[in-house]
């Protein structure tokens, strides 16, 4: 592990008045060397002008702390559904995704995580075709270095992007290979039915490499799960408090095939004295030390 380049961080906020500059400061307070942001609220399309983001100040602070822009992540909003059964919804999704790609590029970031969407009453093949058709339309419309990273999903409702076969179908049919990648989410993988112990995760990576190519994995979301394997529910838990377990997550984080790939925490905030606080700083320290401790009990005992 001494030679392992651990790139670890969390989701951080991007809000007035410091915007991107404030995101960097928040990430540094957690001991991170990467982070992920939404460019606005994930539930809507309302966005502030990119000129207000304090990009130059953010870049200067990143450079001061030797954080590589290529290791940072933007997450597209949840409302983008590339495989909606309604054409007007797909058109809105395409136009807004183009704008998100352009915002991501303006920030100097090269990775944009996208939920592949929910097919609703459509069959799987049609839904998958709609996703790769939209991506092909986008990449033929704009020239960009941004990589759209399809997130592995939990299988809640009619979600797609749940398994390697679905991801392979999309990636095989996207013409601009430089613009497509995958984000592995450990909670979603568990909830979709994948056992994430050492042996089974190795088998998953072997299959992924054979079917798609390990080089397409661009980012990981590191979360424990509140649910049993195969629950198809998607409820994140703090590291070591869920059904995946800290030891299994450490094996994933430090897997030799995943060296130099950013790992992002999206774990829940914790209620202490009626105040919700992030545990990212503590979780990142545990990851760096490869040692778990009961931070929740420790914080509650200070009441």
UniProtKB/Swiss-Prot annotation:
Manner of cofactor binding, per the entry note: Binds 3 Zn(2+) ions.
Transmembrane parts of this sequence: none
PROSITE patterns the UniProt entry points to: AP_NUCLEASE_F2_1, AP_NUCLEASE_F2_2, AP_NUCLEASE_F2_3, AP_NUCLEASE_F2_4
Protein residues bound to Zn(2+) 1: 75, 115, 151
Cofactor section: Zn(2+)
EC id: 3.1.21.2
Domain of life: Bacteria
Binding annotation for Zn(2+) 3: 188, 234, 236
Entry's Gene Ontology BP terms: base-excision repair
Hydrolase keyword on record: yes
Function description: Endonuclease IV plays a role in DNA repair. It cleaves phosphodiester bonds at apurinic or apyrimidinic (AP) sites, generating a 3'-hydroxyl group and a 5'-terminal sugar phosphate.
HAMAP family per the UniProt record, alphabetical: Nfo
Protein name: Probable endonuclease 4
UniProt organism field: Ureaplasma parvum serovar 3 (strain ATCC 700970)
This protein's encoding gene: nfo
């Amino acid at each position: 592990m001494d030679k392992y380049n651990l790139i670890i961080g969390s989701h951080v906020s991007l809000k007035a008045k410091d915007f991107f500059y404030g995101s960097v400061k928040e990430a540094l307070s957690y001991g991170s060397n990467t982070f992920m942001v939404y460019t606005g609220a994930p539930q809507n399309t309302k966005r502030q002008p990119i000129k207000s983001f304090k990009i130059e100040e953010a870049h200067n602070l990143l450079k001061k702390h030797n954080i590589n822009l290529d290791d940072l992540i933007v997450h597209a909003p949840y409302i983008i559904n590339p495989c909606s059964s309604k054409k007007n919804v797909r058109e809105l999704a395409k136009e807004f995704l183009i704008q998100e790609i352009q915002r991501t590029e303006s920030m100097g970031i090269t990775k944009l995580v996208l939920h592949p969407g929910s097919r609703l009453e459509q069959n799987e093949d049609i839904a998958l075709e709609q996703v790769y058709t939209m991506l092909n339309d986008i990449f033929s419309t704009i020239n960009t270095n941004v990589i759209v990273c399809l997130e592995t999903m939990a299988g809640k409702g009619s979600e797609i992007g749940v398994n390697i076969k679905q991801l392979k179908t999309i990636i095989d049919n996207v013409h601009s290979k430089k613009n497509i990648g995958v984000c592995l989410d450990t909670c979603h993988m568990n909830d979709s039915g994948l056992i994430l112990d050492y042996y089974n995760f190795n088998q998953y990576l072997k299959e992924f490499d054979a079917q798609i190519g390990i080089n397409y994995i661009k980012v990981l979301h590191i979360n424990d799960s509140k649910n049993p394997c195969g629950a198809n529910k998607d409820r994140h838990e703090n590291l070591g408090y869920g059904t995946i377990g800290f030891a299994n997550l450490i094996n994933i984080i430090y897997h030799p095939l995943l060296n130099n790939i950013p790992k992002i925490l999206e774990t829940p905030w914790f209620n202490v004295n009626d105040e919700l606080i992030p545990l990212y700083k503590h979780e990142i320290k545990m990851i760096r030390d490869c040692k778990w401790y009961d931070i929740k009990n420790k914080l509650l005992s200070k009441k």
